């Protein structure tokens, strides 16, 4: 008879093997732990090593949800900024607009930034301005719309401002009020002058009560009105409003105070239309001279742009009208009046919130005076600020200013003297 298997003995041997395995595993584990503790006491901790590359408790940074390619160092901002940089919001976008056919004309004799102009009949008088930040012009160039040629040039008075002028014409006499004298961010002058455009002679005119940079300037109801601008340090906002009676290039009385403008600042369009005085766009604050700089080197300061429209009527009270489609500045000479509408070309708008760079404007805006409504009626060949506009025989002209760096980069680039025209149809 065969013997039965001894199950109890087999189970006892298996238990002993398991206990031996656990024993040796435990000994090895204790050895590894001891070695690790010994080693860790003589070298930096893991977290300390990693902190060289990843700071501990680093601050949380809020970044808009956009393509990382547009977050670039300002000092290395490339010229091929992607299209979507310009479409973070409506303010920074190129507003959709009809494409216009542009014809390039004869360029101005010199490039100009912050130049100023007036149109008298078929002649566009272009005044002074920067050739570069280190050089300013002291002359007037004249363009003849009939011949489409630059036809004349003459000097301005030595004491007259070179940029940031207040300027207006009555159809013969050109009133030039205050402004900046010299290059970079030099100080302002209150000296004012009158040009007789028929004889090309200059006349003295009473100085403004205080010097101003780029004040809004117009002739309304027989009085020369000067409003806002920047104060003596170039950055502080001025709200002053003065007027003086004028006729045939002469002052008939003295400067007097008027109702201050509700929102001050420089670089605005100032228009008289339908017996109303309008002030459009502009900004608060501007670049100012760097402290102790012997050349008054321009230093960036905070600028707040706006597209607000203020109107003064027969009651001598300011009223707000609908604002521009987007904030816009540097448009002092960038407007014309045609078909009961104000047309404004180009300008500069709010700083880009990511790159912190200036954004130029490339649209053409129309403000209909009968309906008080704004529209975008076209696009310029490129974005440009401080352009100077004229209108003749159905054509809208613009010349000079500072253009962008290309179709996909709205930052300010080259100072130009180019002139273009397009047929206006509306």
From Swiss-Prot:
Keywords assigned by UniProt? Answer: Kelch repeat, Membrane, Repeat, Transmembrane, Transmembrane helix
- In this chain the Kelch repeats are located at 123-170, 173-222, 224-275, 276-338, 341-394
GO process terms (BP): anaerobic respiration; cellular response to hypoxia
In which compartments does the protein localize?
Membrane
**InterPro entries per UniProt:** Kelch-typ_b-propeller, Kelch_repeat-containing
Q: In what way does this protein cross or attach to the membrane?
A: Single-pass membrane protein
For this protein, the record's Gene3D superfamilies field holds: Kelch-type beta propeller
Q: Which residues cross the membrane?
A: 18-38
Q: What highest taxon heads this organism's lineage?
A: Eukaryota
Q: Which residues form a coiled coil?
A: none
Iron in keyword set? no
GO (cellular component) term, any one: trans-Golgi network
Signal peptide range in chain numbering: none
Q: What is this protein called?
A: Kelch repeat-containing protein At3g27220
């Amino acid at each position: 008879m065969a013997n039965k298997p001894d199950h109890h003995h087999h189970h006892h041997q298996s238990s002993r093997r398991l206990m031996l395995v656990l024993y040796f595993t435990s000994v090895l584990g204790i050895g590894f732990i001891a070695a690790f503790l010994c080693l860790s006491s003589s070298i930096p901790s893991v977290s300390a090593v990693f902190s060289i590359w990843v700071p501990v408790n680093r601050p949380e940074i809020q970044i808009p949800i956009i393509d990382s390619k547009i977050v670039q160092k300002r000092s290395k901002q490339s010229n091929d900024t992607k299209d979507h940089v310009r479409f973070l919001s409506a303010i920074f976008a190129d507003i959709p607009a009809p494409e216009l056919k542009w014809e390039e004309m004869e360029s101005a004799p010199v490039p100009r930034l912050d130049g100023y102009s007036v149109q008298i009949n078929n002649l566009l008088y272009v005044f002074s301005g920067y050739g570069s930040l280190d050089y300013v012009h002291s002359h007037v160039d004249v363009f003849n719309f009939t011949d489409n040629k630059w036809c004349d040039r003459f000097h301005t008075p030595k004491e007259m401002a070179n940029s940031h002028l207040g300027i207006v014409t009555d159809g013969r006499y050109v009133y030039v009020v205050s402004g900046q004298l010299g290059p970079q961010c030099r100080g302002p002058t209150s000296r004012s002058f009158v040009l007789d455009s028929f004889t090309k002679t200059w006349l003295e005119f009473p100085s403004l009560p205080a010097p101003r940079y780029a004040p809004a300037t117009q002739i309304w109801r027989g009085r020369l009105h000067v409003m806002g601008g920047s104060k003596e340090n170039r950055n502080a906002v001025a709200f002053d409003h003065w007027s003086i009676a004028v006729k045939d290039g002469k002052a008939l009385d003295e400067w007097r105070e008027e109702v201050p403008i509700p929102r001050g600042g420089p670089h605005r369009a100032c228009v008289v239309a339908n017996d109303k005085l309008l002030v459009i766009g502009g900004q608060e604050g501007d670049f100012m001279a760097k402290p102790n700089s012997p050349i008054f080197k321009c230093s960036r300061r905070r600028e707040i742009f706006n597209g607000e429209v203020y109107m003064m009527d027969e009651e001598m009270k300011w009223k707000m009208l609908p604002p521009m489609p987007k904030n816009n500045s540097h448009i002092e000479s960038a407007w014309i009046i045609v078909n009961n509408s104000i047309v404004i070309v180009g300008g500069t708008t709010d700083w880009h919130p990511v790159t912190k760079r200036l954004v130029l404007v490339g649209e053409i805006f129309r403000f209909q005076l009968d309906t008080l409504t704004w529209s975008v009626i076209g696009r310029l060949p490129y974005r440009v600020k401080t352009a100077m506009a004229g209108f003749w025989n159905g054509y809208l002209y613009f010349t000079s200013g500072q253009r962008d760096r290309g179709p996909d980069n709205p930052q300010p680039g080259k100072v130009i003297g180019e002139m273009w025209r397009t047929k206006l149809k509306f």
